[in-house]
């Protein structure tokens, strides 16, 4: 990687990486989708939503209200560039501390692996960096979203669907 002010070596090109928060969208009541990889964001989501349910109908949890339905929780899909000269935006699921938690999980830096996440390797070769990225993002989602909401539901005598 080079600094923004540096020029690439001959035969190489400069690509830019931006961390962006998705724009507000009418599908989500003119808000952005919650960061399902971020435990603090999900705890706040539970405070705003599930705690409101508990105030209104909490006495019926486990009886008249046996479960909470969660409709297709997700994180952003990952896109790739299939050809070295392809020019389009690429989206990668990301959260603020991903480089730190990736380093803690694998003893490796995240940012230098970005080319393997963005471009297909020649001949369809297998990528350890890509495997680790998907494994880590899936684990982040499971621990931040599923565990947080699942534990809240269990503590409130609710099933989670």
Go through each PLM region and give its residues.
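Mature extracytoplasmic enzyme cores
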Residues: 1-131, 138-139, 143
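Active-site acidic/histidine clusters and adjacent loop/turn architecture
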Residues: 146
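Beta-sheet entry/capping signal
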Residues: 14, 63-68, 150-152, 157-161
């Amino acid at each position: 990687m080079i600094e923004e002010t540096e020029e690439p070596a001959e035969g190489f090109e400069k690509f830019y990486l931006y961390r962006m928060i998705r724009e507000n969208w009418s599908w989500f009541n003119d808000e952005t989708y919650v960061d399902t990889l971020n435990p603090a964001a999900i705890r706040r989501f539970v405070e705003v939503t599930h705690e409101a349910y508990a105030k209104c109908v909490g006495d019926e949890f486990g009886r008249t209200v046996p479960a909470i339905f969660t409709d297709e929780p997700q994180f952003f899909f990952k896109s790739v560039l299939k050809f070295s000269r392809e020019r389009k935006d690429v989206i990668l699921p990301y959260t603020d501390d991903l480089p730190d938690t990736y380093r803690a999980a694998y003893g490796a830096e995240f940012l230098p692996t970005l080319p393997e996440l963005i471009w297909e390797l020649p001949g369809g070769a297998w990528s350890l960096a890509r495997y680790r990225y998907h494994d880590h993002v899936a684990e982040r989602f499971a621990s931040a979203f599923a565990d947080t909401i699942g534990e809240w539901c269990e503590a409130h005598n609710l099933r989670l669907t």
